[in-house]
Amino acid sequence: MSIAVQTRTAVEIHNAVKAYGDKPVLRGIDLEVAPGTVTVIIGPSGSGKSTLLRAINHLEKLDEGFVVVGGELIGVRAHRGRIRELKEKDILRQRSRIGFVFQNFNLFPHLTILENITEAPISLGTAPAAAKELARSLLASVGLDDKEHAYPRQLSGGQQQRVAIARALAFDPEVILFDEPTSALDPELVGEVLAVIRSLTGTGRTLIVVTHEIGFAREVGDHVIFIDDGVIVEQGTPDAVLDHPHHPRTQNFLSKVL
């Protein structure tokens, strides 16, 4: 197999195919994401959005195709024309360059907020004192510097998601993936999380956000992608996709959510 890597891109997805049993989820998706941009992925539930996002940092293993981040194959290596799985330690190293913010926070309930942020860096060799200093700085950046000794159960959903974002920033990742970061929140808490994500735009990081927040997509997105039934139906600028969609499937979806 010949693999061509584009150094000008932050993320490349080539012919991504994934099925669960006999149900196709991704049907040969190709995508290139420019460095420092915000790409927003929208689409109906079950369309493959989250699966595609999870494939970028190899939380989902593709049946066919491959992913490249920063010029490096993710989760696999090319060997004598074949794709082979990397060792777990090498996959974990790669994931440290790719932040991931989950829909349901995924904080450790038995650890304090500070420990939730320091746990991974310390396990990968960062000195505890340095990890704590960084964690405190990150908590301050998301407005939670007074919560370092609290436990997740003592925080609101919005606060927990802000901690999750701080944790994703702990390795200073090149790319940050957000999997519907506001969908588990009460409506009044959505704004505080979107404000933190908004603050990350223009920092040089590449953000890829799966969301149902169409207004947010219009405001911060450089590129909007509409996915349905495992394929990219339409993509372009927010104005093109959200305000002047060409494909009937895009038009139908937006008519139901706007």
Language model features: what each stretch is:
Residues 150-153, 171, 203:
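Conserved signature/switch motifs of ABC ATPase nucleotide-binding domains
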Residues 176-179:
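Catalytic Walker B motif of ABC-type/P-loop ATPase nucleotide-binding domains
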Residues 187-189:
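Helix N-cap at the start of a conserved alpha-helix in ABC-type nucleotide-binding domains
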Residues 235-236:
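ABC ATPase "signature
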Residues 111-119:
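Short coil-to-helix segment of the ABC ATPase nucleotide-binding domain corresponding to the Q-loop/switch region
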